[in-house]
Amino acid sequence: MERTGVLSKSAIIEREPERQPGGERARHTVVYLTRKAEFSASHFYHNPDFTPEENRRIFGKCNNPHGHGHNYTLEVTVKGPVDPRSGFVVDLKDLKEVLNREVLDALDHRFLNKEVPEFFHTIPTTENLAIAIWERLKTKLSMAELHRVRVYETPDLFVDFFGEE
């Protein structure tokens, strides 16, 4: 199965841009750009400090050690000024490359508990997955500031992480 990779992008302008001489947008205009991607992974929920009964009661079917899978949707939002020369807040090729290398290559078609180091001792909930993705990206995005990581486990369940508050 081939990874679907990047699905779409969106940009939100924080406020109306001002014009500078020559028609260039003001450098202080902040734009939020979101790149969307999909990946498939499996996981299970288990806390070794809980009794078997507690694990079953708290995590239900998600406590099955054989795991279950999801087709996750990831949205990564960066923010920054619009470059007056290119018109971009970020070069999308660079952003796609970082997402592929740091996130999709590491998580796609993986059993998170057993194949992804962040989850060897951490329960791979959607909350913890969003935090782990943030940690993977926060120092790799030199082209713009990481603003938000959104992870959809299902179409009606997602987590937003904005970094440490």
Residues of each region from the PLM?
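Charge-rich, low-complexity N-terminal segments
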Residues: 2-165
